[in-house]
């Protein structure tokens, strides 16, 4: 399965979440670290859903950048 993740930069670190997996979040000091942490968080989240016999959502979210004149 593939899931889109959203990475946001904040003061001193990065955070990320998965729109298709509510509650699945991660942080890291660098963009690479938060991406690695998010990968582990997704695996753990999906495993937890499976262990609890809950449905595992499919990845539907996508992202696109829009250019605007400021």
Per-range role (PLM):
Residues 1-3, 36-70:
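Short, charged, surface-exposed hinge/linker loops at domain edges
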Residues 20-23, 58:
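Hydrophobic residues in alpha-helical membrane-spanning segments
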Residues 7-21:
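Short aromatic-glycine-(Arg/Gly/Cys) micro-motifs in beta-strand/loop hairpins
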Residues 22-32:
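A short, exposed loop/beta-hairpin motif centered on an aromatic-Gly-Thr core
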């Amino acid at each position: 399965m593939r899931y889109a993740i959203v990475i946001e930069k904040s003061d001193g670190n990065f955070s990320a979440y998965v729109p298709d997996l509510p509650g699945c979040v991660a942080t890291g000091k660098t963009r690479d670290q938060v991406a690695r942490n998010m990968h582990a968080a997704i695996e753990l989240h999906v495993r937890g859903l499976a262990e609890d016999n809950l449905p595992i959502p499919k990845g539907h979210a996508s992202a696109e950048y829009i250019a605007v004149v400021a």
